[in-house]
Amino acid sequence: MLIEGGTLLGLAARDDIQRGTDLYAEDGRIRAFGGEAQRLARATEKGPLVRLDARGKWVLPGFVQAHLHLCQTLLRNGPEDLELLPWLQIHVWPGEAAHDADTMSVSARLGIAESLSAGVTAVLDMGSVRHSDALFEAAAASGIRYVGGNVLMDDPETTPPTLRAAAEEGLAETKRLHGEWHGRANGLLSVAVQPRFAVSCTDALMRRAAELARDLGLVVHTHASENRAECALVERRTGLPNIAYLDAVGLLGPRTCIAHAVHAGEPDFALLAERGTAVAHCPSSNLKLASGVCPVPELRRAGVRVALGSDGAACNNLLDPFREMLLAALLPRARYPAEHLPAFDVLRMATREGASALALEGPAGLTAGARADLTILDPETGWSLPDDWSAEPYGSIAYSMGRGNVAATVVDGVVRYRREDPSVGGLKPPADEIRGAVRALRARMEKASAATA
């Protein structure tokens, strides 16, 4: 693949900008720039050369969704104005339990298509207790970089029987998925160990999940300190604050990504930094569920890696990295008037720090040998303006762009989305299929509710 004439924003430093520069990628990796890119493109024997005209456009490392629930895409626009725990109990857990493989597939394909069309190249997906194969199948068909797996939930006191799996069953399913999917699709698919949160898992399961992740070298993906009621419940049950408890059971570490950390405090900042654990900041979800505002400036000052995620379409209603970037940039200005989060830092959180949170191997950014996972933006589409006012384009991206500015999304050196193709290569399910899946899901939810009334 040859991307010609773009402005390359590598995001290694604020001045990591190369204007009017060609980029050549082969076998999923960036190989060369400028004249050398043209030379390699002419000499390639890897088949037909794909050319992208990026003149007047910006090329940057791909956006990463560091916390996502693809199983919830069809649950969008359900009950509103709820806080976390009642929202889970009333809508989300019944909805997840009502999935079959077919509706899970529709939900995943729709969410992945929505993500690719917004420039997202990689996702860390929480999945659900069952039908995880449908998620991996959708990811494999889409060409997105996918880290996910089944969700572990076994506590009979806090989880519904329809969405519960005994510890042995849940861990065995994670092992099966690892054998079936890990490293498949040219390495684009990875399995994670995913205890949902301390509220829904027994202590024994949490400890065994940590052991399994260590044994297999897998990413750990969980929720923590999202909501005050959740934090109080965890401390009442375990005798420890939420994040300290995760450390006590062995779940913190450099391959762990914790979603939210809204109510993390000073001891947590130091502990997360010491363990090398990443945090996925999900501002729109935290606002919509009245959870609060993540202390991102304090986390970053402590040395904690902070990435961005949209959470699920059921709790923010859009899988849109641009909205998360905007909110991530603006919210600190309300909470901490004396400081701000620069647009450059927000873009790093949405890209390079997201890749780090997913433990993606190899060099990051736009350097030779880095993954050819790229987002190409058109600054002159819609209401954004070219970067005439500033030598740096970062503010324009964080504050005034949206998915309409995404000209193309490249994953592993393959174009997976072009703006001219709103169907995302046929990945997006037709409207009739989406409506049918929602109706089937809702009918099963209503039947289950009537049976327990």
PLM ranges: what are they?
Residues 57, 76-144, 170-186, 435-440, ...:
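Alpha-helical scaffold segments that flank or form the walls of functional sites
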Residues 1-44:
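N-terminal metal-binding scaffold of metallo-dependent hydrolase/deaminase domains
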